[in-house]
Amino acid sequence: MSRGLFELRKDAITGWWVAVVVDREFNPRRFNRAAKHIGQTPDDCPNCDLAAGGDHVQVRTLKQDAFIVAGTEKEAREAAPGGREPGLGMVGDNGSYQTIVAPRGHHESLAETSPQIAFDMLAQARDVLTNARNAEKTDYLQIVQNFGTNAGALTDHLCFDFYDLPQIPHRIGEELGGAARFVIREGECPWCRMVREEVAEPARLVYEDAASVCFAPYASRSPFELWVVPRHHAADFGTASDAQLVSAADTLQSVLRLLASLALPKSAA
């Protein structure tokens, strides 16, 4: 009996369903596109100008108060000048858009940079999280690293973008609620169970060391989606120790190098 074209898989945490193609072999040529670069040099790169005279990772603020919660079209129209006062239900300017910038001249990928730079960038990410929480002006902070214009990068410089948002994204809220329900139902942390099960049945296992495990999730939402999950049970990246960040940086670089060995595009991380 045919298995069908798609396999409907259920995310064990959120309960969401994903359609996964199962009737064809993987064809790397469909994804084998070289990462495109802008062609910047240290002399015409704005991030290199920012890092001039320094050999350390820095944080650059691109826009304070970057977000306005407009709500529905009706709510946005009512909150416009001449309409309802923002204090009656609309949220004013808040949040931020910032970037963690590697030192001048660092136009390599995260996989290719030095272990020290990788650690320093993760340490800055940890500090950004801690500072945002202490300021009590954020609900969620998302950190993103793009490489190549294919992935939306606007610079060749090695950097992390981060967005300080005034609300929790829907999927994150579903993961938080789903994890709580999982603990009540199963009596253990869902990510701790994933670590144990993916190592025991390594069909989707990509990399593991003493501190972390990397695997392709069962109900993956996109090609090459990978999860790096620490073995240490903790919920707050902002409390990670330097030793844990050294290990996390090594894991990320190792996984990215494995992806590069597939001769696939170095377009996103």
Where are these predicted regions, by residue range?
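HIT superfamily nucleotide-processing domains
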Residues: 1-269
